[in-house]
A protein has these predicted regions:
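Active-site-adjacent "subsite" loops/lids of carbohydrate-active enzymes
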Residues: 1-10
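Aromatic-lined carbohydrate-recognition surfaces of secreted/lumenal glycan-active proteins
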Residues: 21-23, 46-86, 125-136
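Active-site-proximal loop/short-helix segments
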Residues: 18-49
Length: 147
């Protein structure tokens, strides 16, 4: 599946896309997860997190030198938990692999809180660009997407 996604990324670059937004980059974290298997290796939280980061590295390799922004959409509750071992998410590690993170924000206060928290994860990134609020209403002080 990873190879097919990388082909799609290459095609998007060739078509002139300026940003790739990844959504649902995760292992299943709801339903009957105890019945799911992920290959012959012993399934561990670290194995899942490493798989997500390896995938992001592969996408970055495809995008290297293209100027295309790599973004990811993640749930806002990840700000509090920082990790979701079932899904394979480690927010701090993911933040080092992407140019922008999209998260839900109900209002301006939530957007500001998320921007501050996420900006702390990447000192080399402009917080107003690194975090993009997914909101029903426009927010000030940064990027947003109205959903």
């Amino acid at each position: 599946a990873c190879d097919e996604l990388l082909v799609l990324v290459r095609q998007c670059v060739e078509l002139g896309f300026t940003e790739i937004v990844l959504d649902d980059v995760q292992f299943p974290n709801y339903g009957r997860v105890e019945r799911m298997t992920f290959g012959e290796q012993e399934d561990t939280p670290q194995l899942r997190m490493d798989a997500i980061l390896t995938f992001l590295d592969a996408v970055n390799t495809e995008l290297d030198g293209t100027g295309v922004t790599l973004s990811i959409s993640l749930p806002a509750d990840l700000l509090e938990t920082q990790t979701d071992e079932t899904a394979g998410w480690d927010l701090s590690a993911i933040a080092q692999k992407v140019d922008r993170i999209y998260m839900d924000a109900a209002d301006q206060a939530e957007a500001d809180t998320a921007r501050t928290a996420l900006s702390a994860l990447r000192e080399d990134a402009d917080g107003k660009v690194f975090y993009a609020a997914e909101t029903a209403e426009p927010v000030t002080g940064g990027s947003y997407v109205i959903g």
